[in-house]
Swiss-Prot record:
Source lineage: Eukaryota, Metazoa, Chordata, Craniata, Vertebrata
Keywords noted in UniProt: Acetylation, Disulfide bond, NADP, Translation regulation
Example of a GO MF term: protein serine/threonine kinase activity
Protein name in the entry: Protein HTATIP2
One Pfam family recorded for the sequence: NAD_binding_10
Length: 242
């Protein structure tokens, strides 16, 4: 990771480019933190949320955030919502427990892939995909299989730059109840960092890694960041607060 002085310069250089961004999944745990950090760092000239419902915010910092409400079952009809964005962040996701196996596949694979296709067609140059540690299209575990399938399909779209993030267990206080994740967070949260680094990461660290990677020069058409790389890239890099 670049030192703080270099990182600050990279951020300032990025701001001068007056780029626009869209966020998918801004109502989720990672998406909420991502939006807050993007606004706090003032990285983009235009910020757009794309989702199935309009979100409400109380803070003034959110006043200029644009929102596009779409029907994910009919995304082709909402292609204009994906046009004119330089950068895209996809934090969409649900669980098999909440949506059932078919619903999970529909959201985590079909919605994500169609959104990526529309973003590519709409001119998006840099697509950032939140995936998962262990993602593998050949996995016998549905969750990891779907994540791996999406990664492969999005890579085929040939964005100018594709950044895929594979965090482990996300350490946060979810509003949505996920008992398995809760137990894992309690377990990994009690371990020394050196032990947990391969398996868990705070959400805010994931988000800061995403943004630090964003403003840094790309390392190729596709960048794959595993949990340890995310921890390294996102640590000790506090941005401005709202």
């Amino acid at each position: 990771m670049a030192d703080k002085e270099t990182l600050l310069k990279l951020r300032e250089d990025f701001k001068m480019q007056n780029k626009s961004v869209f966020i998918l999944g801004a109502s989720g745990e990672t998406g909420k933190v991502l939006l807050k950090e993007i606004l706090g760092q003032n990285l983009f000239s235009k910020v757009t949320l794309i989702g199935r419902r309009k979100l409400t915010f109380e803070e003034e910092a959110y006043n200029n955030v644009n929102q596009e409400v779409v029907d994910f079952e009919k995304l082709d009809e909402y292609a204009p919502a994906f046009q004119g964005h330089d950068v895209g962040f996809c934090c969409l996701g649900t669980t098999r427990r909440k949506a059932g196996a078919d619903g999970f596949v529909r959201v985590d694979r079909d919605y994500v892939l169609k959104s990526a296709e529309l973003a590519k067609a709409g001119g998006c140059k840099h697509f950032n995909l939140l995936s998962s540690r262990g993602a593998d299209k050949s996995s016998s575990f549905l969750y990891l299989q779907v994540k791996g399938e999406v990664e492969a399909k999005v890579e085929e779209l040939k964005f100018d730059r594709l950044s895929v993030f594979r965090p482990g267990v996300l350490l946060c206080d979810r509003q949505e109840s996920r008992p398995g994740e809760w137990l894992a967070r309690k377990f990994f949260g009690s371990l020394p960092d050196s032990w947990a680094s391969g398996y868990a990461v705070p959400v805010v660290t994931v988000v800061r890694a995403m943004l630090n990677n964003l403003v840094s020069p790309g390392s190729g058409q596709m960048e794959l960041l595993e949990n340890k790389a995310i921890l390294h890239l996102g640590k000790d890099s506090d941005g401005p607060k709202l």
